[in-house]
Amino acid sequence: MRKLWAPNWLSRRQNANPTRDQSRHALMAWLAAALMSAGAAHAQLNVEITGVGSNQFPVATANFQGEAQAPQNLTAIIRSDLTNSGRFRNVDPAGATVAESAQVDLGSWKAKGADAFVAGSVTPTSNGQYEVRFRLYDTAKGQSLGGLAFTVTQGQLRVTAHKIADYIYEKLLGERGVFATRLSYVSKVGNRYQLLISDSDGQNAQIALTSTEPIISPAWSPDGRRVAYVSFEAKKPVVYVHDLATGKRVVVSNQKGNNSAPSWSPDGQHLAVSLSRDGNTQIYQVNADGSGLRRLTRSSAIDTEPQFSPDGRSIYFTSDRGGAPQIYRMPASGEESGAAQRVTFKGSYNVSPRISPDGKYLAYISRSGGFRLQLQDLSNGDVTSLTDTTNDESPSFAANGKYILYATRVGGRSVLAAVSTDGRTKQVLSLQSGAVREPSWGPFMQ
């Protein structure tokens, strides 16, 4: 039985057919990376901006009238979102409180250096909810760019602030924002693994699963309601689909050997998975309820890490069929419908394919002086290295395709990082204590 070509990848993915000793080695790699203190109270991610884009858009967001009556500071969240994107520069409102219904002297805000201005209000309602209103202005043209009104519960205030930031982002930059999306990731503190779901800024983290065994490879369903992942709680890798609203789980694949690397089809009806049930790891398709297993590859190599293209017509995957791991593309119906074609040619070791939401770019990890995140233009094959770290893994595109979330190591710690696809905006997201890895960026909220 063939071994996987790199122990480093084995410790991250468990996609081959490891012996019991190899599985134990993979677990020890996690243990070595973890810090041994803190608990669930420290599940929130801390964000550090390490690079920003050029030509940042200056925006002033006044304090919303009445927001002191709400348990969330909406304007603080909005300002933080805009700053963290690297695309905006917050202009200090100097403590000004302005409602969306007020007459605004836009010229004075323009004189303060703001090209856009945001005003709003938060009003408690008689049934315990909150009415949130805002308006966005173009100070240069002296005109309104529109606004929205929301009636929400206390628990919805935070996501409402993210939605306001998304509105500002789209109106001013002409592309959809991702502040109201969610992240999934795995934390490791002591001997406890947790699958966590948080807002896009790493806050408001909720525990989906806690285990004393590793959890890897979370993958969001297209509607954002379910997460597929691999759990070792049965003392072997098993693929589950987890309903986030109910907490109910379905075993999607518990075949003999390894069950790993789940990837959703764009319609949310199927998953591609990697299984070693018949020997070498190969790619299969299975229905989201665990039925209808069908083999897609039949090579003598290791075929793993499948990823559907956004149009559902192709599956990208990693294979060593050429002697070393490279990324290939085949029809979504499998190699019986057409031979797989090699996609990556720069470098001798390329793994972990992820396709941008528009299908134009491929993010992957290349071994070149370490493991580095790369971005390939699928139209011409041009490749750009996006990071200066050397332990990158698990890339995941934001829903708008403008940012990539990945795991890496900084200062000896396992952290998450995000980089814009132009390489200019960079963030590091870390836990107060413990290791964090296996990130997946969720889709636009339905």
UniProtKB/Swiss-Prot annotation:
Location relative to the cell: Periplasm
GO cellular component, one term: periplasmic space
BP terms from Gene Ontology: cell division; protein import
Pfam (any one): PD40
InterPro entries, per the entry: 6-blade_b-propeller_TolB-like, PD40, Tol-Pal_TolB, TolB_N
Gene3D superfamilies per record: TolB, C-terminal domain (2.120.10.30), TolB, N-terminal domain (3.40.50.10070)
Protein's UniProt keywords contain Protein biosynthesis: no
Keywords: Cell cycle, Cell division, Periplasm, Signal
Signal peptide boundaries: 1-43
Keyword Cell cycle: yes
Primary localisation category: periplasm
Family: Belongs to the TolB family.
Matching HAMAP family: TolB
Function: Part of the Tol-Pal system, which plays a role in outer membrane invagination during cell division and is important for maintaining outer membrane integrity.
Subunit structure: The Tol-Pal system is composed of five core proteins: the inner membrane proteins TolA, TolQ and TolR, the periplasmic protein TolB and the outer membrane protein Pal. They form a network linking the inner and outer membranes and the peptidoglycan layer.
Protein name: Tol-Pal system protein TolB
Organism of provenance: Cupriavidus metallidurans (strain ATCC 43123 / DSM 2839 / NBRC 102507 / CH34)
Gene: tolB
